Amino acid sequence: MRFDKVIGQEEAKMRLRQLVDEERIPHALMFTGPTGSGKMSLALAFASFLLGERWDGKSTLNSDAAIANAEAMLAKWQHPDLHFSYPTIKPKGAGSDTKVTSDDYAKEWRQMLMGDTYFSLEQWMTLMGAEKQ
């Protein structure tokens, strides 16, 4: 996800760039806002840049080969240093002792991200099949 794909959010992009330029990136950032505000897209674009994708011709990586490799992994949201945690549901018919983790829905999560990064919780729940329960 590149920053040029993020709609609006110019001030937020500027502040994120400032954090990078000043080498003052905190250990955690929370991207919040109403549905449709682009918080997911902005967070994904920033994570992609931190993991090597180019932003205005710059990258956190030093070689073209490393950048190309990182960009290929990020295009499928499968970079080894990119981790997601998201709401899950217990599969229909699962026992009470069944432990559900985000990894159980990784394929569906990547499918959602590949389609459009502007989605709602309701759309995510539908993709997981929550409306059938």
Stretch-by-stretch model annotation:
Residues 2-133:
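Clamp-loader machinery-focused feature within the broader ASCE/P-loop NTPase space
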